[in-house]
């Protein structure tokens, strides 16, 4: 379709999008055939530039604050018109996709992007349905115009770029943003607001299925191991990041994966390694003279990424969904070296640790967090993406766990034997052995040992894991130093948890001093 001197490219194939991106100088090909692009000064999400339009449907339903920032409806309309006019004056790309694999819960989306590569990214990450919108639902629109420059005084934005969600109009406006992860996370936030009304728990987690149909969920912030640990050659992948849990089903919201590439190796992450081929997009990955990706080079960012469709994963759930989970795993990257490699949680502890969302920002996906590593609490293991009050998600989690009798575990992929800089990080093979033990059922009813200050129960034996690793205190040369570190961590938990209005039973399930 042509509009006054420009072309609208609709539903191009992957090959055509790659060709357009190369012809327009948007990227280059790696030796694997993946398209390699750079995203400019933003190499991660920009939380300070994300807004939700305040209108009757959102006014009293959203937890407003520094994460969910209000944007006036009239300002949105003016900015949308301005960005749309800018985009319509040049070539752009349109694809029709779904968000949500379950037939009852998909959102039909018209995705418009200024660049070919961001359209390819969307085709990697969203679902490309055989038939678009068979239920005839109202359509959402994404308008993603990377080269538009916002003017804060005129547009009401925080900077030269913005991400604004308008629930009343079913629109997502992304302007001035080259980092494509904004697109997928915006639609995740949309589903996270809508799904609880349908009694579905939206989750920032990965999911996979065993040969017997048993499902495991992996909750965790970026860098804690969701993508790596769910990409298991012995199991079928559902997805690596965004899922819904309803009665009888866990479904992927996406049609692809978005893997961190820092230090990626074929040995440790063979599934991801093999998926990076023609049709995949590499963001901010440095190539050598032979067009070979150097995943150890962090000169552009620690948050280098690979986007690829699920079709690039040999063992996957063809239906993009599974049954309810037998095992729910909360992944935490503990910088203090205090937490054990695995703890078995009861329901109250599950609610406590879900609300706390304790972990570290590792090679953070957020702009402005720097390259360093620091501890953080992120409610529901994904605070930036959950617009409703946290308690609503926690109540749904407990309802789902109770309903299916799912077992819940806290798995530390961080440090042991001392804090960051002193101790050592658990190896991926060690964590994989912990996960395998959980999935085999070996820890159900296992004999445990109680750790007082952090108030956790650890199994006395885990197949494939050295026994001396299980109790973190025994790993520290200086036991008094461990106790002090444990008290310090407990204080952080207790201070963070003061903001939650929950039952005394849940409050008592956390660390105690």
Curated annotation (Swiss-Prot):
Substrate binds at residues 45, 179, 185, 305. GO terms for cellular component: cytosol. Binds 1 Mn(2+) ion per subunit. The keyword rRNA-binding does not apply. One of its GO terms (molecular function) is metal ion binding. It comes from the Bacteria. Its EC number is 4.1.1.49. Its main location: cytoplasm. Its cofactor is Mn(2+). InterPro entries: PEP_carboxykinase_ATP, PEP_carboxykinase_C, PEP_carboxykinase_N, PEPCK_ATP_CS. It catalyses: oxaloacetate + ATP = phosphoenolpyruvate + ADP + CO2. One of its GO terms (biological process) is gluconeogenesis. The keyword ATP-binding applies. Keywords: ATP-binding, Cytoplasm, Decarboxylase, Gluconeogenesis, Lyase, Manganese, Metal-binding, Nucleotide-binding. Pathway: Carbohydrate biosynthesis; gluconeogenesis. Monomer. Involved in the gluconeogenesis. Catalyzes the conversion of oxaloacetate (OAA) to phosphoenolpyruvate (PEP) through direct phosphoryl transfer between the nucleoside triphosphate and OAA. Belongs to the phosphoenolpyruvate carboxykinase (ATP) family. This is Phosphoenolpyruvate carboxykinase (ATP). It comes from Pseudomonas putida (strain ATCC 700007 / DSM 6899 / JCM 31910 / BCRC 17059 / LMG 24140 / F1). The gene is pckA.
């Amino acid at each position: 379709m042509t509009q006054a001197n420009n072309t609208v490219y609709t539903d191009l194939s992957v090959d055509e999008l790659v060709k357009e991106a190369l012809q327009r100088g948007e990227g280059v090909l790696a030796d694997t055939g993946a398209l390699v692009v750079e995203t400019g000064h933003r190499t991660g999400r920009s939380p300070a530039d994300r807004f939700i339009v305040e209108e009757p449907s959102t006014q009293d339903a959203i937890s407003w604050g520094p994460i969910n920032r209000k944007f006036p409806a009239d300002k949105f309309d003016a900015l949308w018109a301005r960005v749309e006019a800018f985009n319509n004056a040049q070539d752009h790309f349109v694809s029709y996709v779904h968000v949500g694999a379950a037939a009852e819960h998909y959102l039909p989306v018209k995705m418009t992007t200024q660049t070919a590569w961001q359209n390819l990214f969307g085709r990697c990450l969203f679902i490309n349905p055989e038939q678009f919108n068979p239920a005839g639902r109202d359509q959402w629109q994404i308008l993603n115009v990377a080269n538009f420059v916002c003017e804060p005084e005129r547009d009401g934005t925080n900077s030269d770029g913005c991400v604004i969600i308008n629930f009343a109009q079913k629109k997502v406006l992304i302007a001035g943003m080259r980092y494509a992860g904004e697109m997928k996370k915006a639609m995740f936030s949309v589903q996270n607001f809508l799904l609880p009304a349908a009694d579905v728990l939206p989750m920032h987690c990965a999911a996979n299925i065993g040969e017997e149909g048993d499902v495991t969920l992996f909750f965790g912030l970026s860098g804690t191991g969701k993508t790596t640990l769910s990409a298991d050659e012995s199991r079928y992948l559902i997805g690596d990041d965004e899922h819904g849990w309803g009665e009888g089903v866990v479904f992927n919201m996406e049609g692809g994966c978005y893997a961190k590439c820092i230090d990626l190796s074929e040995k440790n992450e063979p599934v991801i390694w093999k998926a990076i081929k023609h049709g995949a997009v590499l963001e901010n990955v440095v190539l050598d003279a032979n067009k070979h990706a150097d995943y150890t080079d962090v000169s552009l960012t620690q948050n280098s990424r690979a986007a690829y469709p699920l079709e690039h994963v040999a063992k996957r759930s063809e239906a993009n969904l599974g049954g309810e989970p037998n095992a729910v795993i909360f992944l935490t990257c503990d910088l203090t070296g205090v937490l054990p490699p695995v703890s078995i949680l009861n329901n109250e502890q599950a609610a406590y640790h879900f609300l706390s969302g304790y972990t570290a920002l590792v090679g953070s996906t957020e702009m402005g967090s720097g390259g360093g590593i620091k501890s953080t609490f992120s409610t529901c293991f994904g605070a930036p993406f959950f617009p409703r009050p946290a308690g609503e998600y926690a109540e749904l989690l407990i309802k789902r766990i109770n309903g299916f009798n799912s077992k819940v575990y806290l798995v530390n992929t961080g440090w042991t034997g001392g804090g960051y800089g002193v101790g050592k990080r658990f190896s991926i093979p060690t964590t994989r052995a912990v996960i395998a033990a959980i999935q085999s059922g070996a820890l159900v009813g296992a004999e445990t040992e109680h750790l007082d200050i952090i108030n956790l129960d650890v199994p006395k034996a885990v197949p494939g894991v050295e026994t001396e690793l299980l109790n973190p205190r025994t790993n520290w040369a200086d036991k008094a130093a461990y106790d002090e570190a444990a008290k310090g961590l407990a204080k952080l938990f207790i201070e963070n948890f003061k903001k939650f209005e929950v039952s005394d039973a849940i409050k008592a399930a956390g660390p105690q001093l």
